[in-house]
């Protein structure tokens, strides 16, 4: 029987083969859930609704931190350094659209000290800027509450395939205490934030990894509070989604981006 600890190693929400640096076990098709998750219980997003959303070719999501840098999850990449193997797709909700903007990566920066637990953020520099709105990140915990929006091209059900169209859903904040009652010591409360419905049914899933969790700020602008990271299955009752707490790493992200 898989323990929660083992599951955490498997449930990073990315489909990228070889990109989950911490995975010690390889999943065969049809087993548990080790891939970028789509949004379970979501509805289709409108064209232009979330213009900062990015789909990454390794099977993860991301958001435009700047017009030339994508913020995603550390477990979606294999390390830091020059990297021209990733293609970012932006500007569309339909990945098959002829209007899609596709740009190659030039460099990747994985969070310093990332070892598979916490610190799940990374930056990908693109070969050229994408002329689309960016997503501001929270640098204070003031927005780490309320109801959040998640979006992605990941699976629409646990074990399902990736989606052609961008899906969106709303999920409520879950306290650290409540989240720890589900995940125990696997949760890093100082670095992670949880969200989801107690009864399940709405969640990010395989293929959504690295995508943003966001809400409106005091000026009614979108602000990113989380990065899709991991969870037990998708949309299961009493197992909320776990997200990197962006405000905790805002200064480090800003500094790293400036050095790229």
UniProtKB/Swiss-Prot annotation:
Any single biological process term in GO: proteolysis
SUPFAM superfamilies reported for this sequence: Trypsin-like serine proteases
GO MF term set: serine-type endopeptidase activity
Listed CDD domains: Tryp_SPc (cd00190)
Cysteine-cysteine disulfides: 60-76, 179-194, 205-234
Keyword Protease: yes
EC number(s) per entry: 3.4.21.-
Enzyme superclass (EC): hydrolase
Entry annotation: catalytic residues: 75, 120, 209
Keyword check for Transit peptide: no
Propeptide: 35-38
Taxonomy, superkingdom: Bacteria
InterPro entries, per database record: Peptidase_S1_PA, Peptidase_S1_PA_chymotrypsin, Peptidase_S1A, Trypsin_dom, TRYPSIN_HIS, TRYPSIN_SER
Domain Peptidase S1: residue ranges: 39-258
UniProt keyword list: Disulfide bond, Hydrolase, Protease, Serine protease, Signal, Zymogen
Family the entry assigns: Belongs to the peptidase S1 family.
Task of the protein: Involved in mycelium differentiation.
PANTHER family, per the entry: ACROSIN-RELATED (PTHR24252), HYALIN (PTHR24252:SF7)
The name this protein goes by in its record: Trypsin-like protease
Biological source species: Streptomyces exfoliatus
């Amino acid at each position: 029987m898989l323990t929660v600890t083992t599951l955490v190693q498997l449930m990073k929400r990315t489909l990228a083969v070889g990109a989950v640096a911490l995975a010690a076990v390889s999943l065969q098709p049809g087993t548990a859930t080790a891939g970028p998750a789509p949004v379970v219980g979501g509805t289709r997003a409108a064209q232009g609704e979330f213009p900062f959303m990015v789909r990454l070719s390794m099977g993860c999501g991301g958001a435009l931190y700047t017009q030339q840098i994508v913020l995603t999850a550390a477990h979606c990449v294999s390390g830091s350094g020059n990297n021209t193997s990733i293609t970012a797709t932006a500007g569309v909700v339909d990945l098959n659209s002829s209007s899609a903007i596709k740009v190659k990566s030039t460099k990747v920066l994985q969070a310093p000290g990332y070892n598979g637990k916490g610190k799940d953020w990374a930056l990908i520099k693109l070969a050229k800027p994408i002329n689309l709105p960016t997503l501001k990140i929270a640098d204070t915990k003031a927005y780490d509450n309320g109801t959040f929006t998640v979006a992605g091209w990941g699976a629409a059900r646990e074990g399902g395939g990736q989606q052609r169209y961008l899906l969106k859903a709303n999920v409520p904040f879950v306290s650290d205490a409540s989240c720890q009652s589900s995940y125990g010591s696997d949760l890093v409360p100082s670095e992670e934030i949880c969200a989801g419905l107690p009864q399940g049914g709405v969640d990010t899933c395989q293929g959504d990894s690295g995508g943003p969790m966001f809400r409106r700020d005091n000026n009614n602008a979108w602000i990113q509070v989380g990065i899709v990271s991991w969870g037990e299955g998708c949309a299961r009752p009493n197992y909320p989604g776990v997200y990197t707490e962006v405000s905790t790493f805002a200064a480090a992200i800003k500094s790293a981006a400036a050095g790229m």
